[in-house]
Amino acid sequence: MNFVQENNQVLYIWGGTISADIEQEVNQLKSIPGVKVNVENAERVLLGGYGQSQFDIILANVSTGNSELVSHLLKLTKPKGKAVFKDDSAAGGAETVRANLLLSGFINIASAEGNVYIAEKPNYEIGSAAKLSLGGGANKAKVAAVWKLDVDDDGEAEERIDEDELLDEEDKVKPSAESLRVCGTTGKRKACKDCSCGLAEELDAESKGAAVAAAQSAKSSCGSCYLGDAFRCATCPYLGMPAFKPGEKIQLSDTQMQADV
């Protein structure tokens, strides 16, 4: 009875049949100022309809091996409230009782004479959550300050790079159009598929100019080119042209340039 204080809410649980000792203990509890006592049989506790965290002290003459009942008594106890068990049926003694109470959620378990065991409910409700402070704020501030540069700091130890020193005189020379060409810069001169630097047009003009020059400078090696295709070689530059007089300048009319229908 030393566990009960004034104005406590007490749940007294008895097992078996009511005896004179039980009535005497209940009367002693009621004599404490402000104490309210609820008396319940062990088999009826689960059906009693008591509220969660209702009692400051629970006095239970029950077996701690009944895990369902012990867990229910934990719910009925207020945070930091106590439950006092009198267990005469524990086969393994104090260690077994201690293990049963710990597995049910009680802490700070102590034993007393007469197979009496005192257990305490943790200072929080079952299912409650609490925010953990892992000290991340201080570490974040330190990390953020590592790369921070003070623009007003004129300390002599600070070394800065002059951007002008990163460029050589060759880098400052304006490039020419030839140096910017992409196609035709490796091996044989060949324009890209989507040439935009002018090389395609240049090569096309060169090829046409070469063909014209070849035609203008063409000379007969057989001496019979002017006679017509029947007397011309397969590689004759005048192949396909009409016969002409030796030394005559060849000009094709518009009608000759049109294909026959």
UniProtKB/Swiss-Prot annotation:
Residue sites binding [4Fe-4S] cluster per the record: 222, 225, 233, 236
Region (N-terminal SAM-like domain): 4-134
Entry keyword annotation includes Mitochondrion: yes
Keywords in alphabetical order: 2Fe-2S, 4Fe-4S, Cytoplasm, Iron, Iron-sulfur, Metal-binding, Mitochondrion
GO cellular component: mitochondrial intermembrane space
Region (Fe-S binding site B): 222-236
UniProt binding sites for [2Fe-2S] cluster: 183, 192, 195, 197
Chain segments carrying region Linker: 134-173
Residue interval(s) of motif Cx2C motif 1: 222-225
Motif (Cx2C motif 2): 233-236
Coiled coil feature spans: none
Gene3D superfamilies: Vaccinia Virus protein VP39 (3.40.50.150)
Principal location listed in the UniProt entry: cytoplasm
InterPro entries: Anamorsin, Anamorsin_N_metazoan, CIAPIN1, SAM-dependent_MTases_sf
Residues covered by region (Fe-S binding site A): 183-197
Physiological role: Component of the cytosolic iron-sulfur (Fe-S) protein assembly (CIA) machinery. Required for the maturation of extramitochondrial Fe-S proteins. Part of an electron transfer chain functioning in an early step of cytosolic Fe-S biogenesis, facilitating the de novo assembly of a [4Fe-4S] cluster on the cytosolic Fe-S scaffold complex. Electrons are transferred from NADPH via a FAD- and FMN-containing diflavin oxidoreductase.
Record family assignment: Belongs to the anamorsin family.
Quaternary structure annotation from Swiss-Prot or TrEMBL: Monomer.
Domain remarks in the Swiss-Prot or TrEMBL record: The C-terminal domain binds 2 Fe-S clusters but is otherwise mostly in an intrinsically disordered conformation.
UniProt name for this protein: Anamorsin homolog
Natural source organism: Culex quinquefasciatus
Organism lineage string: Eukaryota, Metazoa, Ecdysozoa, Arthropoda, Hexapoda
